[in-house]
Amino acid sequence: GRGSLREGAITRNGPRTIVFDLSGTIELKSPLVIEKSHLTIAGQTAPGDGITIKDYNLHLKKSSHVIIRYLRVRLGDRNKQGDDAPDCITVDYCDNVILDHISASWGVDGIQDTRGCTNYTLQWSIFSEALNNSVHPKGAHAMCASFRAPLSNMSIHHNIFASSRDRHPTIGGSVQDPQWIVD
């Protein structure tokens, strides 16, 4: 509705910064798929305990110049079935993206999946506790973070990848010779 995270991130156009007057948990009713550019989600503006997104994933798709800061994503497997096994955060074919101070956990497939991005930064974040025995069609899964087919520079620094079975993180599949800075 009016003034919501979804309205600001999906329906508005042009450069914008989303700020929060309240803190709390946003129970998504569907995935938050962001296909707009020039967006900052400033979670640090929320008072008190900050902002948590739960029940559905955050998906950046063909976006550019996006900054997301100080946000928690707790996917979980509520209302999920075997063919619906998302990651907490997916970033597909985006450029100039910064994820900063993100805490993500309880992904059905994994915590984070990035593919085909240019100038991507993940910093000061915690990705942990993917669900191992959940509703994933392959059975036990619990992957952490995957950075696939980067097209250009990628910076992954000062992060914690923990308490998942695999991909702590996995980087690969590039068709070019990008620079990777991993700390």
PLM segments and residue spans:
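Short His-Asn-centered micro-motif
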Residues: D21, K54, I171-G172
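Solvent-exposed adhesion/ligand-recognition segments of exported proteins
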Residues: G3, I18-D21
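Generic beta-sheet signal
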Residues: R16-I18, C117
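Right-handed parallel beta-helix
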Residues: H38, G43, S64-L75, Y93-W106, ...
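Extracellular beta-strand-rich solenoid/capping regions of secreted or surface-exposed proteins
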Residues: R2, R6-G14, I26-A42, G50-Y70, ...
